Amino acid sequence: MKLIVGLGNPGARYRFTRHNFGFFVLDQLAEDQDIMMSQTGFDALWGKGVIAGQSVLLAKPQTFMNLSGKSVRKLADFFKIVVEDVLVVHDDLDLPFGVIRLKAGGGQGGHKGLISICDSLGGPEFQRVRLGIGKPAQRSAVERYVLEPFTESELRILPRIIVTARSAILEVISSGIKTAMNSYNGMVINDLIQEV
């Protein structure tokens, strides 16, 4: 079984913020695959299904970003999922908006949700779908920036990014992370928002 985790913060206040990018993609994946994420427990909203012949568990931790690992660890332990079968979908300040990068293992880039997951799972070997959100002009503004909503120009292209990220996840499930990396890691989806 694969555990696919979308990162974000619960509650209406954070619903449309950049930090909830992972939630957006997971919601799209669940809708397209007819997987109801209505189960509660393990500090998450979650649901089980089958994609490309493989059992999958989709989950959105409800712990707030900085404690995401608590939920991921509970799910992985209960369903006996090894760290290499965990795929985390998250926003990434180090990538421009419109860029998606797939990655297996590696550093956390200062992302507090990833740090929490790495600490909770005992290592960084989980897979990631990194969703670029760009950076604010001033480094000191990062905390505010990730909790702001997307701009109007970003919103125009957001659906395309979400659908592309969903397709990348499907390829990870069906063909493996390396094949999906070859397909998606050179892609840039920002032709409509050069002004951002």
From Swiss-Prot:
Its EC number is 3.1.1.29. The active site is at H19. It catalyses: an N-acyl-L-alpha-aminoacyl-tRNA + H2O = an N-acyl-L-amino acid + a tRNA + H(+). InterPro entries: Pept_tRNA_hydro, Pept_tRNA_hydro_CS, Pept_tRNA_hydro_sf. GO terms for cellular component: cytoplasm. Its main location: cytoplasm. The record marks N9 as: Discriminates between blocked and unblocked aminoacyl-tRNA. CDD domains: PTH (cd00462). Keywords: Cytoplasm, Hydrolase, RNA-binding, tRNA-binding. It is found in: Cytoplasm. The record marks D91 as: Stabilizes the basic form of H active site to accept a proton. Gene3D superfamilies: Peptidyl-tRNA hydrolase. PROSITE patterns: PEPT_TRNA_HYDROL_1 (PS01195). GO terms for biological process: protein quality control for misfolded or incompletely synthesized proteins; rescue of stalled ribosome. TRNA binds at Y14, F64, N66. One of its GO terms (molecular function) is tRNA binding. Hydrolyzes ribosome-free peptidyl-tRNAs (with 1 or more amino acids incorporated), which drop off the ribosome during protein synthesis, or as a result of ribosome stalling. Monomer. Belongs to the PTH family. This is Peptidyl-tRNA hydrolase. It comes from Syntrophus aciditrophicus (strain SB).
